[in-house]
């Protein structure tokens, strides 16, 4: 679902000051995911390193997947443009990528009306 991120700090993209960016994690394709991973490694200076942390704990990947969600809606923007974003906006974009990885937007709530039955186990044999 397409949403709009309002930036606290406007960023210059193609000579235009931008303070709103559309994004949609459903538009992250396999090639865009791979480009996000490659851009992350390049930014970190580890382009040739094969070992990476688990995706759930890779906060830099979360940021670049947030960038990918923006690029999915705005193909004229690239990772280099988005790397100029700074401050709190960086954390907001990282949260977009984190939610994509963790699927937190799709979590269902627990129905407290369900009956949970707990049967204690015997600690000693009879």
Where are the model-predicted features located?
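Short, surface-exposed, charged amphipathic helix/loop patches that serve as local interaction elements
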Residues: 2-126
């Amino acid at each position: 679902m397409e949403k709009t991120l309002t930036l606290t700090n406007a960023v210059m993209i193609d000579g235009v000051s931008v303070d709103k960016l559309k994004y949609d994690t459903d538009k992250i394709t396999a090639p865009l995911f791979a480009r996000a991973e490659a851009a992350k490694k390049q930014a970190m200076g580890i382009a040739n390193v094969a070992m990476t942390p688990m995706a759930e704990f890779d906060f830099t990947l979360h940021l670049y997947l947030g960038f990918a969600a923006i690029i999915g809606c705005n193909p004229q923007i690239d990772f280099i443009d988005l790397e100029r974003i700074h401050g709190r906006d960086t954390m907001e974009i990282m949260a977009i990528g984190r939610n994509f990885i963790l699927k937190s937007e799709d979590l269902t709530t627990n129905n407290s009306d369900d009956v949970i039955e707990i049967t204690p186990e015997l600690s000693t044999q009879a």
